[in-house]
């Protein structure tokens, strides 16, 4: 395996409903994904190559605000060769956040914890990320060499911009491109905000979750391309990373259809640019293990130091 043949999925989920309920799946609109999803399910599903690359490794991301779920994902990462890093959850508002993070890092699979995430998209406070208790928690995250996965909706991007301004040393990655309003709504406000966010060099962006922001049944590559072009122009290939958002992506076509779309959108890209988006940027941000036999290709992203974990 060489790095030029490697594909990293920097954003997917796993859940075992027999072990841990996922109450958000009670929404009738999510009935199609209301079942257990395992690493083997992902292996058997994710067969489409992108620019000739096959899936080599992944970053699994928390779903619920629940430390035991994160513990489960870390223990799984320790046993599962496909999973190279975990984006976990801990209560950023808790005075005990430092102790909780230390326990996670010292526990089973703790070395796989590379970033934290909170579903800010569900918070009604327009300044949630600037709350003093949240900022204290983010300082604890930064102090342990971890990154932060920013999950906000388009109208909440101002919070993400303020976060970037106030935490210039905290490595941040915007999830799902800030959820642009692709399905028949004017994306001008999203574009303006995302370009401002991209002015901060410590902020990267996941090209993920776009198809579920489009019309699930009728979207085409043409619907995705305007958002793709904004992201490439704002962040550049070296600060973008591919993610599937599987199995949520199954609501709008699934892993392979999204992969085929990305393959089409990469037409005309250089080898270096494709490697950055498909593997290099995620490898640097999440401190993933380098690929065996890949010493001939630089997998570093100069603007993103590897977290100290």
Regions found by a protein language model. Name each.
Residues 7-17, 174-177:
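Histidine-centered catalytic micro-motifs
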Residues 2-8, 26, 30, 36-51, ...:
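Mid-to-C-terminal alpha-helical segments outside catalytic/metal-binding sites
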């Amino acid at each position: 395996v060489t790095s030029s043949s490697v594909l990293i999925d920097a954003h997917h989920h796993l859940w075992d409903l027999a072990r841990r309920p996922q109450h958000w799946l009670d929404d009738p609109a999510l009935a199609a994904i209301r079942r257990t999803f395992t690493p083997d399910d992902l292996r058997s599903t994710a067969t489409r190559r992108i620019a000739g690359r096959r899936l080599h490794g992944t970053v699994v991301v928390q779903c619920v605000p629940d430390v035991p779920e994160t513990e489960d994902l870390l223990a799984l990462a320790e046993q599962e060769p496909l999973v190279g890093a975990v984006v976990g959850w801990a209560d950023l508002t808790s005075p005990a956040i430092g102790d909780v993070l230390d326990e996670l890092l010292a526990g089973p699979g703790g070395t796989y914890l590379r970033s934290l995430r909170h579903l800010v998209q569900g918070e009604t406070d327009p300044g949630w990320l600037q709350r003093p208790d949240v900022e204290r928690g983010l300082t604890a995250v930064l102090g342990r060499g971890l990154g932060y996965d920013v999950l906000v909706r388009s109208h909440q991007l101002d919070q993400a911009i303020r976060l970037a301004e106030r935490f210039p040393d905290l490595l941040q990655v915007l999830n799902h491109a800030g959820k642009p309003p692709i399905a028949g709504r004017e994306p001008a406000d999203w574009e303006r905000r995302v370009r401002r966010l991209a002015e901060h060099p410590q902020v990267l962006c996941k090209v993920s979750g776009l198809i579920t922001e489009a019309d699930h049944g009728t979207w085409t590559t043409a619907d995705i391309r305007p958002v793709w072009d904004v992201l490439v122009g704002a962040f550049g290939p070296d600060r973008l990373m591919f993610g599937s958002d599987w199995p949520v992506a199954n609501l709008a076509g699934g892993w392979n259809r999204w992969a085929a779309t990305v393959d089409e959108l990469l037409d005309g890209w250089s080898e270096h640019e494709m490697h950055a988006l498909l593997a290099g940027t995620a490898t640097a941000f999440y401190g993933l293990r380098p690929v065996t036999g890949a010493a001939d290709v630089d997998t570093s992203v100069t603007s993103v130091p590897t977290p100290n974990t």
